[in-house]
């Protein structure tokens, strides 16, 4: 069972800033993908090992998971992977995007916390403020991938992104997945669980315009 963490808590005002990319990646000029809500990071560990022509940053609000991921990094040869702890809004707001401005090629939100109660919808990760912050670090044509098994959350994410003038929904056939951050179509642990239990997956792709 996934443990929910309130992203609006004062505990997350202090964040782990993303340092200059030349300090964390062997080749900082590679295309950059962000996975927001990366959990334990296993998805990114596999991605980064199989796709050496991309750099990956995982952002996770649960500090223990980031600490464990960084411990694993010490025993693995992932020269194109970095983990950052904190609320994504605060990470991008406080760093002013200096380290990654106009460098993000794509972003994924995979099965984020649904926060079912209406009074908690403001805790859902995709909010107008975050989209504005992210757009400042995304190149024109950069992509946002959203995926969930919760229809209400999917509708919320779609509505929030569609209301932004900075993003446009595009059909799947317009995306060359062979050139994407995940050409092997690697699945997260949650996605494997959903498929195994024959549950429906809702997903969309948006382009920065």
UniProtKB/Swiss-Prot annotation:
**Broad EC category:** transferase
Name the InterPro entries on file. Answer: SAM-dependent_MTases_sf, tRNA_(Gua-N-7)_MeTrfase_Trmb, tRNA_methyltr_TrmB_bact
A molecular-function term among this protein's GO annotations: tRNA (guanine(46)-N7)-methyltransferase activity
Binding positions for substrate? 117, 149
Substrates-to-products reaction catalysed: guanosine(46) in tRNA + S-adenosyl-L-methionine = N(7)-methylguanosine(46) in tRNA + S-adenosyl-L-homocysteine
Q: Name one GO cellular component term.
A: tRNA methyltransferase complex
UniProt: S-adenosyl-L-methionine binding residues = 35, 60, 87, 113
What keywords tag this UniProt record? Answer: Methyltransferase, S-adenosyl-L-methionine, Transferase, tRNA processing
Pathway field of the UniProt record reads:
tRNA modification; N(7)-methylguanine-tRNA biosynthesis
Q: EC annotation?
A: 2.1.1.33
Q: Which residues form the active site?
A: 113
NCBIfam families reported for this sequence: tRNA (guanosine(46)-N7)-methyltransferase TrmB
Function according to Swiss-Prot or TrEMBL: Catalyzes the formation of N(7)-methylguanine at position 46 (m7G46) in tRNA.
What HAMAP family does UniProt report for this protein, alphabetically? Answer: tRNA_methyltr_TrmB
Similarity field: Belongs to the class I-like SAM-binding methyltransferase superfamily. TrmB family.
UniProt name for this protein: tRNA (guanine-N(7)-)-methyltransferase
- Lineage of the native species? Bacteria, Bacillati, Cyanobacteriota, Cyanophyceae, Synechococcales
